[in-house]
Amino acid sequence: MPESQRQPYFVLVRPQMGENIGASARAMWNFGLEQMRVVAPRDGWPSTRAVAMASGAGRLLDTAQHFDGVSQAVGDTSFVFATTARGRGLTKPILAPEEAMRQAAEKIAQGQKVAVLFGPERAGLENEDIAGANALISVPVNPDFPSLNLAQCVLLMAYEWRRAQGQVELARMELAKTQWAEAIEVEKLAQHYEERLEDAGFFFPQAKAPGM
């Protein structure tokens, strides 16, 4: 199975600006995601503004699928996540991005097709869009300013997807034009310093030398 088919579909629902579609494509491609679907973009499709903003990620726009409605966009998928910034009073699981993408990875590994819905910039997804979703994704943002730009939300989900794939290093050490010393080399260096310090009279009084 091609790598692109082992990924979730990121579905942009009624995006209002071509620039945000292009920025979302860049965010997806930053983390190796290729499957974009676009539902009823306000400014039409294809979008020259999206292409201009996508820069090196234009390939995603070339292969992006266009749909008239959400139900058509997710019709071939078996599990749908919907992103939301506020509670909807619906009886659905509400997951943090990390857990949602972990579950998405598990389902895709089992052969399921998974979609993630992203709403319009101004007000987000409508309840009608969310009704058919299996679970909601809620980002723990500042409650006094919960609004995320479309591309920001896409970037966050794409990053968590990559983490779920085990492709994010939590820490590393880079050695600039050098390599790790062997234990014997470290020991010899310590002996060298000790000899030089002793020659300089650093270990005084001599009785305290072993503890210094």
State where each predicted segment sits:
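Post-transcriptional modification and biogenesis factors for structured RNAs
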Residues: 1-212
